[in-house]
């Protein structure tokens, strides 16, 4: 619908692991332990995407930025590549809903980083590091917070309305 590329940092990182790259080897334990991968590594992967001419002005980031450092890095990368952020939305989902959804995903995808203790660590880390990012972007007039604890079809409708698709 949008003629855009969804860029998931999780997918990029899992691809590095799958390819057995140097980056993949260095991050596998952190990811399996529910830790966030360093900003330096994530930013380098995002930089490659931002400067990909095929994707210019057609990017949708999923799971990035997750820290204030990453948000500031993204601003620099976009400026240096003559791009800008058009819209920002945050899916606000409570811990209980996240746990239920990941338990379902665990059955379907059988991901090694989807055990309960890892999920809880990731959630706590996410909440600690993401709050400053939300404060940073909430000042943007194109920022929208969407209740992510609703049914998926309701969330999809709200996102589509926000994106005008």
Predicted regions: what they are:
Residues 10, 46, 60, 89, ...:
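Residue-level signature of catalytic and energy-coupling elements of molecular machines
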Residues 38, 62-63, 90-91, 147-148:
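Small/polar loops that bind or transfer phosphate-bearing groups
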Residues 158-165:
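C-terminal alpha-helix
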Residues 41, 45-49, 111-155:
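Small-molecule kinase domains that catalyze NTP-dependent phosphoryl transfer to phosphate-bearing small molecules
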Residues 68, 96, 153:
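Loop/helix-junction capping segments adjacent to catalytic residues or to phosphate/diphosphate-binding pockets
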Residues 5-76, 80, 108:
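ATP-dependent small-molecule kinase phosphotransfer cores
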Residues 1-3:
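A conserved segment at the C-terminal end of the G1
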Residues 14, 28-30, 73-129:
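A glycine- and Lys/Arg-enriched "phosphate-lid" helix/loop adjacent to the NTP-binding pocket
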